[in-house]
Structure formats: C-alpha cells, structure tokens
Amino acid sequence: MACQIQASRVFPVLEIEKGLSFMINVFHRRIKASSITLTSFPYPMKSFQIRRPNRKIAFALDTGSSIPGDSGEGQEMNGDRTGLGSTRLGRIAIAGGKQLLGKINSARKNFPMKIFLLLLGFYTANALATILGQTGDWDVLVAGIVVAAIEGIGMLMYKKPSSSMFSGKLQSFVVFMNFWKAGVCLGLFVDAFKLGS
C-alpha cells in the first residue's frame, strides 16, 4: 500500500484585522492519502485561531503617544484600558521608556564631537601624567589646577539652572567641556591603576 503524507506548516503570523483584533494562525496540516484526501483536522480551522478583540499593540521603541489605526488616525494611549497601559506599573514602564528614548535621542546630537572630546581629555590626562612624572617639580601645582578645573566645570554643569544665566551657546560649550572633563578623569583613573600595578 502506497500512502503519501504531505505536511505543510505556516509559521505563527500576527495579523491585524479591522477593529485591531489579533488572529494567530497556529498551524495548518494537509494529509493526502492515495485514495482519501484530508484537507483539515476533524476540528474546524477556527478552533486554532485565537481572537482577542479590542487589543492594541504597544511598540517598545515608539516615542509618540498614539497608535496608528486602520484609517491612519492616532488613538491615545491614555484611553487604552487593556494591555500594558491598564495598570499603574504599565504606565510607569511606558513613561520610563519614553524618558529613556528621549535621553538617547538627545545624546545622539553632536555624538562624534562628544567622543572626540572624551578621547582628547583621556590624552590630556596621559600627557599630564607623563610630563609631570618626568619633572616631579610641578606635581602639586598642576594637580591643584586640574582639580579646580574639574570642580569648576562640574559646578557650571550641574548647578540649578537660572532664568537667563546661560545662553544656548554657552550651555553647549559647558556640556562639551564636561565631556572633556570626563575624559581627563578617566585618564587619571587609568594612570592611577597603572602606577598601582
């Protein structure tokens, strides 16, 4: 008896239908015998489909507050009473994700310049440690100047913002100097480890 069995599998697919309902096609098999052809299981195919009406997709990387619907309009996340946004923990997670993405997007501004200043600060610390290690006469004076510069930049960077103290360009300059300061601190930290070993 020759019997031919052919099975085909459709991988789980997430489809969005009208009304934002989910349909998950779990699998579909087709068995063919020589004289008998079965096109489905004894149960209808609808038993393998899971429908969840009124569900909305929460995108992890979306910074907007709306989800595009079928008509292209946005629907507010605050009105969502199902899914992640329905609990207090979900709302905290969504707000934290939006804040994190905002900070990541603001850090991307002038990213090459920030990396350059970080590496320049690292090089400055290595040059200071090498030159001052050779002479040995200026150690205390230069260490005091470096500490004063680091503390001054930190004071300008992290003090409470006043109404019109800084213009935009001066604030940007202080942010860039803060990256240079971070490079100097990192370089001195690495040199201290080299001397300790």
Swiss-Prot record:
One of its GO terms (cellular component) is chloroplast. Belongs to the ycf20 family. Signal peptide: none annotated. The chain crosses the membrane at residues 113-133, 138-158, 173-193. It is found in: Membrane. Keywords: Membrane, Transmembrane, Transmembrane helix. GO terms for biological process: nonphotochemical quenching. This is Ycf20-like protein. It is a multi-pass membrane protein. It comes from Arabidopsis thaliana. The keyword Membrane applies.
